[in-house]
Regions:
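Catalytic phosphate/metal-binding cores of nucleic-acid and nucleotide-processing enzymes, i.e., regions
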Residues: 1-141
Length: 141
């Protein structure tokens, strides 16, 4: 596949993922149009999801170790790396996350193990476990 076709395929998948995340979480997600090095592919408008760093991949051949390293680098020390991928011809999206972010009591070391979830299970995890409670009172200093 040529470079332009691959970029279009990637951009199309990122838009699809943003729409699916919006539907699944009830929050607006959007594709980041001009990615700089270290930026995630898809971001939420809601600050409660600010730590989530999403990397999207749609490819004929899966390169999970390399993609996971990219997701980890983009997330940095404070972020939560999430790799959403689909192999061409496969049914549905898969979501890879750090096992520590799923259950820190069982997996106390960040970055040592990953867990791959189906879309529905991943969205339940994202809705229930990930949002940071952002509390503020406008007008109060």
């Amino acid at each position: 596949m040529s470079g332009a076709m691959a970029r279009n395929k990637g951009a199309s998948f990122e838009r699809k993922v943003a729409n699916m995340l919006t539907e699944a979480t009830g929050k607006v997600w959007r594709r980041r149009v001009r990615n700089a090095v270290g930026d995630s592919d898809v971001v939420a408008d809601d600050p409660a999801f600010a730590r989530i760093s999403i990397e999207c991949k749609h490819a004929n051949t899966l390169c999970l170790p390399a993609w996971w390293r990219q997701a980890q680098q983009q997330a940095g020390e404070q972020g939560v790396p999430v790799l959403i991928y689909r192999q061409t011809g496969a049914r549905g999206e898969s979501v890879m996350v750090d096992a520590h972010d799923v259950n820190p009591k069982i997996f106390p070391v960040r970055g040592r193990h990953t867990v791959t979830l189906g879309w529905e299970a991943a969205m339940q995890w994202m809705r229930e476990m990930l949002p940071v409670k952002v509390t503020y009172s406008p007008g109060i200093i």
